[in-house]
Amino acid sequence: MVEQYLSVFLKAVFVENLALAFFLGMCTFLAVSKNVKTAIGLGIAVIAIETITVPANQLIYSLLLKKGALTWVNDYLISTDTYNFAEVDLTFLGFISYIGVIAAMVQILEMFLDRFMPSLYNALGIFLPLITVNCAILGASLFMEQREYPFGESVVFGFGCGVGWALAIMALAGIREKLKYSDVPPPLRGLGITFITVGLMSLAFMSFSGIQL
């Protein structure tokens, strides 16, 4: 059991890193990686959101959305001749359900940071509410559904996805701070050298792809 959880976690962090393997959440990844302190704050926020929303969406999927999930409703019906809930398939509601859960969690996190950590709240600015539509957050829930992780593994997977994304943005922020003091050719300054850096980081993480866990 522990080995399985460890395998899911390490794959989510290194082998299947959402930012550097699937290039999810690139908008926020590039925009908030100019400063290490801000990147750490956003990374922690993403870890919290992923750890909560992935298992929450797993419960919604397994108990309500997937085909046969509503079989328990038949126990409360007098007769199943008219309608049999065992045949109901609501997976088409997955996107809107997952986004609703993510939006609610981000709103709670936003209120928490505004109340207790106003400096970080102001530093993140518009990118904090944009976590709601960050495809890395939604992508983790969709991967969970596709791979049909049970609840325990979905918690570990969500945490691992958040840690992997946070690790990537903090590493990029550290490199970009060093690049400020480097002699970068004028045409490549700004996003140009940043794209090259992200590409090299992605190539480095590809070395983990051959690991079997």
Swiss-Prot record:
Residue stretches spanning the membrane: 12-32, 40-60, 92-112, 124-144, 155-175, 191-211
EC number: 7.2.1.1
Main EC class the enzyme belongs to: translocase
Entry membrane topology: Multi-pass membrane protein
Record-level Gene Ontology MF annotations: oxidoreductase activity, acting on NAD(P)H, quinone or similar compound as acceptor
Organism domain of life: Bacteria
GO terms classed as biological process: respiratory electron transport chain; sodium ion transport
GO CC terms: Gram-negative-bacterium-type cell wall; plasma membrane
Compartments, as annotated in UniProt: Cell inner membrane
PANTHER family: INTEGRAL MEMBRANE PROTEIN OF SOXR-REDUCING COMPLEX, NA(+)-TRANSLOCATING NADH-QUINONE REDUCTASE SUBUNIT E
NCBIfam families linked to this entry: nqrE (TIGR01940)
Similarity field: Belongs to the NqrDE/RnfAE family.
Protein name per UniProt: Na(+)-translocating NADH-quinone reductase subunit E
